[in-house]
Regions:
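Structural motif corresponding to the intra-repeat A-B loop/turn of tetratricopeptide repeats
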Residues: 32, 36-39, 77, 81-84, ...
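Amphipathic alpha-helical segments of tetratricopeptide repeats
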Residues: 5-9, 47-54, 95-99, 140-144, ...
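Non-transmembrane amphipathic alpha-helical segments
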Residues: 4, 26-29, 49, 71-74, ...
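Structural register within alpha-helical repeat arrays
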Residues: 18, 25, 29-32, 63, ...
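Acidic, Ser/Thr-rich low-complexity linear motifs
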Residues: 11-20, 37, 57-66, 82-83, ...
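Amphipathic alpha-helical protein-protein interaction segments
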Residues: 365-368, 387-685, 689
């Protein structure tokens, strides 16, 4: 018998009242925990709540409220300890409360909101898309079950808007972003001007509008985003703990407008806002590094326009401050180090001192070494470091780093990035492969150079063309293994939210490292599966040569370090150094076609050449190379039959598809042809006689 049950017996308290006493005891312990932070108090709250529920009659009208309270207590302990079982139990008991509450009940929306928040918390922990989907459904139910005059409506609307915005970040579905913006606007409309959450809701809307601007490029969205962020700042008292975050957000939006319009006044105001954000952040605050980092970025923007050394020097100083105030295990440390490395690169460009270039390389290498960071930040830092190592002629270190980057690339995905960042990542991947190829060619490692280049290009294509990727092929053959690989990639790339409680954040960091190790093992397992030995590795040189049925493939690789042509035929592999073709003399690229044509040795007729441009040569028109004056034959048109392919692996894919299509036609044993008459043309005069001529053609 519990103390309360004994007390009830001694004092003639009804047994029906005992659950109420346990509930009061639980609430008291919870309130005491909120004051003291004592783990014993939150555990006492949970134990008391459970005892009261166990003693309650199933028809007790207070049971659903007690279940809901228990869910809140369990989630609170989860935030303290990170114990997943507490979060799972919280979801279970609040779901039970919701299912026991009839539609139209005044407490239903609040319970739905709690359940949605807990499911969202599980999504943040695991990255499981099904949890985000369910959280959105629950939040939508909460809104739909709330009358317009209910004081909680604005909160439920805000929650739904944030969840929809989160799904947009994962899927890039514009319908989600549009609904998120509409919902956030409704939340603000129902929020009084003196409400303590108004600024946070305005800040959310500003971020959503900023996302739509990044996607669509509509200036009105950026203008609305700035005005909304400005309202958030103006609605916040000077000593409010979130003021620095709102100021930083406003500064970012103003910086975006400055980049678009080139208006210096916007950049000046952005710097002022970022500086105020730094000043509003107390020493020791976890956000201190982020605020310093943002200020450094804006100072560099002004330096790039004015070349005032004081801005560059202050940017380096604030960037270093961000790094120094960030613990080694922090997931954003790589981003801060990356920025400081780039600031020192700017200093080297100004001073020409190798010491400054060495500092830049050192910071970038540190960023690469941050194992707790998402792969995106590590790869971008290492790719820039490769460029700087080339300037310093540190070839061996460049090869070592480049190989490690290529090994990490299968762990990076771009789905959670905005379009500008996606394009940046793809170009970064290509740059890594091109630079590594150049380093290897400088040490006469031709086979390895070509295979590394193809590996990088294969990974790029897997990001751009999912239906032709190694992963799509694996899904077809081994769905469960492919899903495990994709799940681990998602987990390794999942960003850590700044609002995540400290203990949970530490567990997420630990889990990210575990997931990275599991991903390495998963890759090894995949490459042991017959037919998938080269998963995310590109082809071997032998495989490349097997797909060349006629002519040659010519790869032109132009980097700041060196330029080369690699010529691959079905029985040979050779390279031609192109000393006259450098990054600074790219206008001389027609030399490439001339040299390559003279080395292809056609047995008869014009040689067939498949062109692949790499590095700075990726957009060059090799088929149009040469002299085109009247009567001249010194050009690619007269010497070659030119085609293009993004990679040799893609050429093999296209050949296999064509072969399969031909086999299907042969199996049908019919000759078919599609003939279309065009009596009208969208951009031409058309031919009214075309339909009459069709029977004769047939």
């Amino acid at each position: 018998m519990t103390d309360i049950e004994a007390l009830a017996t001694d004092n003639d308290i009804s047994r029906e009242d005992i659950p109420h006493l346990f509930s009061k005891l639980a609430i008291g312990a919870y309130e005491r925990y909120m004051q003291t932070g004592s783990r014993d108090d939150i555990s006492k709250a949970i134990d008391s709540a459970k005892q009261g529920i166990d003693l309650a009659n199933d028809r007790n009208p207070w049971l659903t409220q007690w279940l809901n309270n228990l869910g809140v207590f369990l989630e609170t302990r989860y935030e303290r300890t990170g114990e997943m079982k507490d979060l799972e139990e919280a979801i279970k008991v609040v779901r039970q409360a919701v299912e026991s509450t009839p539609n139209g009940h005044p407490d239903l929306a609040a319970m739905l909101s709690n359940l949605g928040n807990e499911v969202e918390t599980r999504y943040e922990r695991t990255g499981e898309m099904k949890d985000l989907e369910e959280a959105i459904q629950i939040a939508r139910r909460a809104v739909e079950s709330t009358p317009n005059d209910h004081p909680g409506l604005a909160t439920w609307l805000n929650n739904l808007g944030v969840l929809l915005a989160n799904r947009y970040e994962r899927t890039e579905g514009m319908r989600d972003l549009e609904e998120a913006i509409q919902t956030a606007r409704r939340a603000i409309e129902w929020t009084p001007n003196d409400h303590p959450d108004l600024a946070a809701r305005l800040n959310n809307l500003a971020n959503m509008l900023g996302r739509r601007y990044e996607r669509m490029g509509e200036m009105k969205d950026l203008e609305d985003s700035i005005e909304t962020a400005r309202r958030a700042v103006e609605s916040t008292p000077d000593h409010h703990p979130n003021l620095a975050a709102w100021l930083s957000n406003l500064g970012n939006k103003l910086e975006s407008r400055s980049e678009r319009t080139r208006e210096m006044k916007d950049l000046e105001e952005a710097i002022q806002a970022a500086r105020r954000a730094v000043e509003a952040t107390p020493d020791g605050c976890p956000d201190q590094a982020a605020m310093s980092n943002n200020l450094g970025i804006k100072l560099i923007r002004r330096y790039e326009r004015t070349e005032e050394m004081k801005d560059l020097e202050e940017a380096i100083e604030t960037g270093r401050r961000a790094v120094d105030s960030t613990p080694d295990y922090h997931p954003n440390l790589a981003a801060w180090l990356n920025n400081v490395g780039r600031f020192f690169e700017r200093l080297y460009e100004q001073t020409g001192k190798m010491r400054d270039l060495g500092e830049a390389s050192a910071y970038l290498l540190q960023a690469w070494s941050c194992l707790h960071a998402v792969p995106f930040h590590r790869v971008t830092a290492a790719a820039k470091c490769l460029e700087l190592l080339a300037i310093q002629n540190r070839v061996d270190q460049g090869i070592n780093l480049g190989r490690k980057i290529l090994d990490l690339l299968p762990s990076v995905h771009t789905r959670t990035l905005d379009r500008n960042d996606q394009q940046f990542v793809i170009s970064t991947f290509a740059g890594v492969a091109s630079d590594l190829c150049a380093f290897l060619l400088s040490t006469n490692r031709l086979t390895e150079a070509l295979e590394c280049l193809e590996q990088g290009r294969a990974i790029i294509l897997s990001q751009l063309l999912d239906d032709r990727s190694d992963l799509s092929s694996l899904r077809h053959d081994h769905l469960q293994l492919a899903n495990r690989y994709q799940s681990l990639v998602d987990e390794v790339n999942a960003p850590t939210r700044q609002t995540t409680p400290g203990v949970v954040e530490a567990l997420l960091r630990k889990r990210r490292q575990e997931a990275a190790a599991e991903l390495d093992m998963c890759l090894k397992e995949i490459r042991c599966v017959p037919g998938h030995e080269r998963f995310m590795l590109g082809q071997t040189v032998t495989e490349m040569q097997e797909c060349i049925t006629e002519g040659s493939i010519v790869v032109i690789n132009i980097t700041n370090f060196r330029s080369d042509a690699i010529i691959i035929s079905n029985n040979s592999l050779r390279t031609i150094v192109l000393p006259e073709l450098s990054a600074s003399k790219a206008r001389l690229w027609h030399i490439v076609a001339e040299v390559s044509a003279s080395k292809t040795h056609p047995s008869e007729g014009l040689p067939r050449v498949w062109w692949i441009g790499s590095g700075l040569a990726s957009s060059m028109l090799f088929h149009a190379a040469g002299v085109h004056t009247r009567g001249s034959t010194e050009n690619a048109y007269c010497r070659l039959i030119s085609s293009y392919t993004p990679s040799i692996k893609e050429l093999a894919y296209a050949q296999n598809q064509a072969k399969r299509a031909q086999e299907v036609l042969m199996a049908q044993d019919t000759n078919t042809m599609l003939i279309a008459a065009m009596p009208t043309s969208p951009k031409g005069p058309g031919d009214e006689k075309a339909p009459k001529e069709l029977p004769r053609v047939e």
